[in-house]
């Protein structure tokens, strides 16, 4: 019986996601056993600055990918939104399980909704994507950066001077906390989700054919297709955490992919947005990127990157 070593970050959410996925594999009843290896990533250690200032995408995966390449682990369970657009040679996303709720969750101290927040209220987020879109709709709000895992951020909301914070609904759902803490879900038209938000990425070595066959049982074709379009868009624009960038795709009634893509200025004063419909994930992602580039997306990205230096 083969033992599969599964790499995971140490946070409660990461381990919850990893153990959930292992349970899906165990339920297949095939002759494998599983062991979780906890790995500390750079993003877990550096908590005193915003994600955009310490390298953006890849912060939560590089050490885990190193363990995959050196064969310390056989596969890793990541949040898809943490994945860089390009993976190291020899590694691949071997499986995308069914996506859960991709929306952002608004959590306020008083129970007030986003629209009801008092003028000048303090909103906690570590995401340029969230802050740009929410400032575009409510320029009167003050954004204050907040870092840490889910439990830390919820504690900071209670104890510090934040009036509200924004978290991914998916993480709260996976922890079983969504019903008790979420004030409201932010509609995708108000705040377009991050590329891959709500989806998991199961990363493994390209040459591990045995494991890839096992993972194929859990793969969700719709999630794979929609996330692929989002990630092609992200790759074309070379956008990481250093710029407000968003992309969310769904499948239409006619089985086409509909991708809404967005790039914004840091302060939310400019939001470029396009919706593209097509059948091929790569073509849809590239088309969305090209349309935004024509609107001036590259200039916004350059300006954002200069602002981070």
Curated annotation (Swiss-Prot):
EC number, as in UniProt: 2.5.1.61
Cofactor note: Binds 1 dipyrromethane group covalently.
Pfam family, one: Porphobil_deamC
Residues of the signal peptide: none
An annotated GO cellular component: cytoplasm
Chemical reaction(s) catalysed: 4 porphobilinogen + H2O = hydroxymethylbilane + 4 NH4(+)
GO molecular function: hydroxymethylbilane synthase activity
S-(dipyrrolylmethanemethyl)cysteine: residues carrying this PTM: 241
GO terms, biological process: protoporphyrinogen IX biosynthetic process
The keyword Hydrolase appears for this protein: no
Cofactors required: dipyrromethane
Assembly and binders: Monomer.
Extra remark beyond the main annotation: The porphobilinogen subunits are added to the dipyrromethane group.
Family listed: Belongs to the HMBS family.
Protein name per Swiss-Prot or TrEMBL: Porphobilinogen deaminase
Organism in which the protein naturally occurs: Bacillus anthracis
């Amino acid at each position: 019986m083969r033992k599969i070593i599964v790499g995971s970050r140490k946070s409660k959410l990461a381990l919850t996601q990893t153990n959930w996925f292992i349970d899906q594999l165990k339920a297949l009843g095939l002759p494998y056993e599983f062991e979780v290896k906890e790995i500390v990533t750079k993003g877990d250690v550096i908590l005193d600055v915003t994600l955009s200032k310490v390298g953006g995408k890849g912060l939560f995966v590089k050490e885990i990918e190193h363990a995959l390449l050196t064969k310390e682990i056989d596969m890793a369970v990541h949040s898809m939104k943490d994945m860089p657009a390009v993976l190291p040679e020899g590694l691949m996303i071997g499986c995308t399980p069914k996506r859960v709720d991709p929306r952002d969750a608004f959590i306020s101290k008083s129970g007030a909704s986003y629209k009801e927040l008092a003028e000048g209220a303090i909103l906690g987020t570590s995401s340029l994507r969230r802050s740009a879109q929410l400032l575009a709709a409510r320029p009167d709000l003050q954004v204050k950066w907040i870092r840490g895992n889910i439990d830390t951020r919820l504690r900071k909301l209670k104890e510090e001077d934040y009036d509200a914070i924004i978290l991914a609904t998916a993480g709260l759902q996976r922890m079983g906390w969504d019903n008790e803490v979420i004030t409201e879900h932010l509609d995708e038209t108000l705040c377009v989700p991050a590329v891959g938000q709500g989806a998991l990425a199961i990363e493994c070595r390209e040459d591990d054919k045995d494991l890839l066959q096992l993972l194929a049982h859990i793969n969700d074709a719709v999630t794979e297709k929609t996330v692929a379009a989002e990630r092609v868009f992200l790759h074309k624009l070379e956008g990481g955490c250093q710029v407000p960038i968003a992309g969310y795709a769904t499948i239409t009634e006619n089985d086409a992919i509909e991708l809404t893509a967005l790039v914004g200025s840091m302060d939310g004063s400019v939001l470029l947005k396009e919706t593209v419909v097509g059948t091929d994930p790569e073509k849809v992602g590239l088309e969305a990127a090209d349309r935004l580039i024509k609107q001036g997306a590259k200039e916004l990205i350059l300006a954002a990157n200069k602002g981070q230096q």
